[in-house]
Amino acid sequence: MKNQNKKILLLGSDGYIGSSLYDYLTNLKYDICNVDLFWFGKMHQNTIQKNYDELTVEFINKFSHIILLAAHSSVAMCSNSLESCFNNNVSNFIRLIEKINNNQTLIYMSSAAVYGNNDKLVDETYPITGGLSFYDYTKICNDNIASLYPNKKIVGLRLGTIGGFSKNFRCENLINSLATASIKSNKMIITNPENYRSVLGMKDLCRSIHAILESDTIKNRIYNITSLNAKIIEFAEKIKNINGGELIVNDSLPTNYSFNCDSSLFQTDYNFKFNDTVETIFVDISKNLHMIVSNLKRTPR
């Protein structure tokens, strides 16, 4: 199926991921319909402002692929109320699955945070026993719920911490925070230096979704999606080597999150190679800082 025969429904089109993904797929000549609530700003003039839960079955069934980005998308956003984040992340997700037919493909975003506090390199078979936060629980629920619909084409992506430029930037993400601090103040402050993080470059994420769109064989499956793994201190030291400046370790804000993910399954199933590095992500941010339209911190909802 050629691009012009595919119709993409992009839910959460104007957020951090959506802003970049829309531009990427538009450049590839995909037919895209955007839907977003503009919680963090309006990035695209053609976006429909609506809660995706209000979309009808008839409307949703017009599309060959649905990409679900709309969510309470961070631990912080979910911190005040399990009810609100559960309604958005889980209840709306279930109703969306019920609306799609077996010929459509749904791509949704899960998170590597579901692995919690684990320094070992883990793949998708690693047992998930429980989350460290409301956010984690909603993502674990989504992954379990998706598996209950084996006849539907549902692809879940357990994303590493995303790094890279977007017009709707997220400055609190690890590489984004380190890069902007290094560029603007010549100083980086980190906590939990020995904890691991899986980092996903924005360009790799866009490429991975493109690979799914182009695939003729879709498995109902969850994939780890990450470009590289390292300790937080190692990411900071690499950026210091690139751009110089002072590196300060502050251990006054400990966290239990430490995750280290193997993305081999996705690479095998989609004949894909992750290319992003700390260097490519840093360059992507540094050369596009002046293009940032919104840089709002993701706060509780």
Predicted feature descriptions by range:
Residues 7-27:
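N-terminal Rossmann NAD(P)H-binding glycine-rich loop of SDR-like oxidoreductase domains
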Residues 42, 230-232, 250-270, 276-280:
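Active-site loop of classical SDR/Rossmann-like NAD(P)-dependent oxidoreductases
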Residues 52-88, 99:
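NAD(P)H-binding glycine-rich loop region in Rossmannoid oxidoreductase-like domains
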Residues 94-134:
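Conserved Rossmann-fold NAD(P)-dependent oxidoreductase catalytic core, especially the SDR/UDP-sugar
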Residues 145-197, 202, 232, 239:
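NAD(P)-dependent short-chain dehydrogenase/reductase
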Residues 162-166, 189-199, 221-230, 252-256, ...:
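Glycine-rich Rossmann NAD(P)(H)-binding loop
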Residues 178, 208-211, 215-254:
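Mid/C-terminal beta-alpha module of Rossmann-like enzyme folds, strongest
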Residues 277-301:
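Amphipathic terminal alpha-helices
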